[in-house]
């Protein structure tokens, strides 16, 4: 296996979020690699410990183990926060697996000065509740600004 093929394979899994081995085969062929077939991709997936997991759109996709590792305080926020959405009552932040509690702790440390009453974090989802005097749109802007500045 060439270094170029290995590098391209890992980049595809890290960036493109492929759901099937045939999609990976097609993508590598489009990049000019020859002799690529499903059985070779299957061996590469096993060799690098790739697993199938759900992305934020609830699609099953291949990921490399380093993407699934527990993030730490040195992980850039841009790599951890996948989506920020809201309704009239709260903000929902989607993160990479394992990152929600780390980010919730950061938000809790900022707390009431930014209009955050509190957070509830699971593995990859955070609920952020505003203080009673903070409009949800203003809190959303504060949270988004925090992630932009920390990127």
Swiss-Prot record:
GO terms for cellular component: cytoplasm. InterPro entries: Arg_repress, Arg_repress_C, Arg_repress_C_sf, Arg_repress_DNA-bd, WH-like_DNA-bd_sf, WH_DNA-bd_sf. Its main location: cytoplasm. Keywords: Amino-acid biosynthesis, Arginine biosynthesis, Cytoplasm, DNA-binding, Repressor, Transcription, Transcription regulation. GO terms for molecular function: arginine binding; DNA binding; DNA-binding transcription factor activity. SUPFAM superfamilies: C-terminal domain of arginine repressor, Winged helix' DNA-binding domain. Pathway: Amino-acid biosynthesis; L-arginine biosynthesis [regulation]. GO terms for biological process: L-arginine biosynthetic process; protein complex oligomerization; regulation of arginine biosynthetic process. It holds the Pfam family Arg_repressor_C. Signal peptide: none annotated. It is found in: Cytoplasm. Regulates arginine biosynthesis genes. PANTHER family: ARGININE REPRESSOR. NCBIfam families: argR_whole, PRK05066.1. Belongs to the ArgR family. This is Arginine repressor. It comes from Haemophilus influenzae (strain PittEE). The gene is argR.
